[in-house]
Amino acid sequence: MSFHISLLMQQGQAAINAKNFAEAVAFFAQAAKESPKDPQIQACLGQSYCWQGLRAQGLKYLRVSGQLLLKRAKKNRDTRLALDLADQLQYWGDYSGSLDVCKQAVQINPEYVRGYQLLALSHSRLNQKKSALVAGRKALSLAPGSAMLAILLATLEIADGLHEDARKRLEKVLTHPAITPEEKFRAHKELARVLDKLKDFQQVFTHLHAAGEIAPRIPEVAKQDAALVPALLATYQAEFTADLLGRWAQATFPNQQPAPVFLLGFMRTGTTLTQEVLGAHPRVFVADETDLVASVVKELNRISKFQGSVPEQLRQLDFAGVLYLRDFYWQRAKALFGDKMAGRLFLDKTTMNSIDLGVINCLFPDAKLVFLLRDARDVCLSCIMQTMIPTPSTVHLLTWQGTAQFYAQVMTWWLTVKPKLSMEFIEFKYENAVFDFEVAFKPVFSLMGLEWDPAVADFHKNAAGKYIASPSFSQVAQPLYSSSVGRWKHYQADFVEIMPILQPFLDVYSYE
């Protein structure tokens, strides 16, 4: 590496450290122009684009870096850097790109366990269950004492219906002498899931409660601010008035881009199923679990010089500021998705943007909203059964009481803000979609201004083989099933302690 290129790389890294990603892109792009076959430069350029929000461009360079690293690995059989790159592709949601790198890496060095681990994860997230299972078994055969790989293989076995195999494997993992808190937590969670599938309902909550007791010892959980979201919801309930929410309801907005449709709800209410059905319409483009609204809130904070609460900042905003933030949203969307979204109705499905409903309504009063509902008992059961990435929201779903309380906080916010909304919305019950598909979905398409297309009933065919950023990724790659309705009835004794919290919402939405 020449002195000049080395200097460009140092300047690029300094820009990253300062979070000036546009400047970092400029430095790394110049370095790449001078040394186009250097995988490190290509990777740095790709990462910088991704951090800047230009994911489509970033992934292009990350993929190039992966191929250059594989070319080097063929000479020395050292696939570690190539697999680090595959891991980065997974981080940015490019499981197809990661799969390509992993397939080549395990051919170059078939004895390196991490290659098969990442290969299994790539296949799994793309709903390629049999291939994931083969890779998971190979990984564990190379490191038979690994509790982490045993848990991974058990999750793949559960996905493929090998429930008894998974149960035995997980029970064995829990006897492992050197098991870490995170591994123990995961094993209890997965064992609860497989026992549920085996209809051994009496043992399920024993493992869910055990996982909840272990969770605070996991570093990623411990560092989350559990008070953040409840405090935010309390502020929003008090400060988002009907006047504020309707402030720009009669405004005329530029019509270069139709207003988005927002698909929201609580976790595990069927938002992923609904996005796949709506996204099966040829005129709909789905943005799946993005940071678009979160980025707009950050930008609002920045231009408001971080003074006051979000509702107070919106009160101080003039119409030019509203137009700026709308444009900021669309520019970021275009950076993420490029030309793929052109000419199509933009469906923003980021489930917990429910928290930011006030911001959404203020800035996009011309948007449409689909809010998902589901029996609160099935919601809470499904939430506590899932293993989710720790965030200030998901840390509430680690215990039974915490799950019910957080559900109540979010739904109280919805019931408070709903009568004040100026945007058009529809409440959509998951159960209606399961039992009367066409009758349930036709009003949603009507709200979106779209004709009914019978082809949307085959949504699961589109979902198979693609990456879906939700714990439900495997469930929506199959036809609708009714077994997810009324699951709570298997656990009626466990619901006694949280029913006082849930009953008001069951009453409001007429769930018996």
Predicted segments — roles?
Residues 254-364, 372:
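Phosphate-binding active sites in nucleotide-utilizing proteins
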Residues 135, 164-178, 187-257, 312-313, ...:
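PAPS-dependent sulfotransferases, especially Golgi type II membrane carbohydrate sulfotransferases
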Residues 360-384:
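Conserved phosphate-donor/acceptor-positioning beta-strand/loop module used by diverse small-molecule
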